[in-house]
Amino acid sequence: MIMKKLLLLFPLLLSCLWGIAADEFRVAELRCEYRDNPLAINTLTPQFSWQTLSVGRGFLQAGYQIQVASDPADLARGRKLLWDEQRKSDVSLHVRYAGRTLKPGQRYYWRVRVSDAAGNYSPWSEIRSFAVGLLDGSDWDGARWIAFEELPDSLRVVPGQEFNKIKIGDRKTALNRLPQFRREVKVTKPVERATVYVSGLGQFELFLNGAKVGDNFLDPAWSDYDRQVCYQTFDISEELQPGGNVFGVMLRSEEHTSELQ
């Protein structure tokens, strides 16, 4: 009986060992500028990072190969690469891009594989993406600020100046509703990718065809508006529909301030 158990156990162990040898290590947790598939990075030379998963103990990365392309199909075939670096190194953090010049507002795709000390390579990682943001004022050419109608002085409520005695039934008329903007856009051709960049002096919410875009709150981040204005990026490729589309923006009711306390 003991011999039969040993004979049954041996093929089981052998099959487990054979499975380990077939797929020993792979790459996971790919990040570009510390983010997964970022929509807008603020540099033309991004940094890449990844982790290596191994079924065996003590695995050490001895080298890597990283590739970047502007089209995922070209990247999968290893064609029209913007960057293809193969190096003997155990570094897997902050690998700086050193390929052809990237362009603001464009999306790119990348993948990586690693090797062990014997020169054996892992399978290629999943293809990930990143997009370069709008880095300077010239990238905003064609965009313009939009604003609510000018508020007449007779309807302006000035803090500290409105302490008049008010009795029940008296009213004060003012334009205190939330400023809202609406714009219709017609899509007449197939759209592969659509990105919206929105900036505002204060907070805003963006709507497309009646639905709020994204799950963010209090966009954009606060800053000193005399020096810098932040913006938010949204991928609306799936929300944009053929034919007519309606964009809406609702701003916060309070006036923006250039000094943050």
Residue ranges and their predicted role:
Residues 8-16:
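Bacterial N-terminal signal peptides
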Residues 29, 47, 61-65, 193, ...:
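Exposed beta-strand and adjacent loop surfaces of beta-rich binding modules
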Residues 22-57, 126-140:
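Pro/Thr/Ser/Gly-rich low-complexity, intrinsically disordered linker/stalk tracts
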Residues 50, 88-98, 107-111, 116-118, ...:
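Accessory beta-strand-rich segments of carbohydrate-active enzymes
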Residues 17-21:
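Sec/Tat signal peptide C-region and signal peptidase I cleavage site
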Residues 133-171, 249-258:
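An acidic-aromatic loop/edge-strand motif
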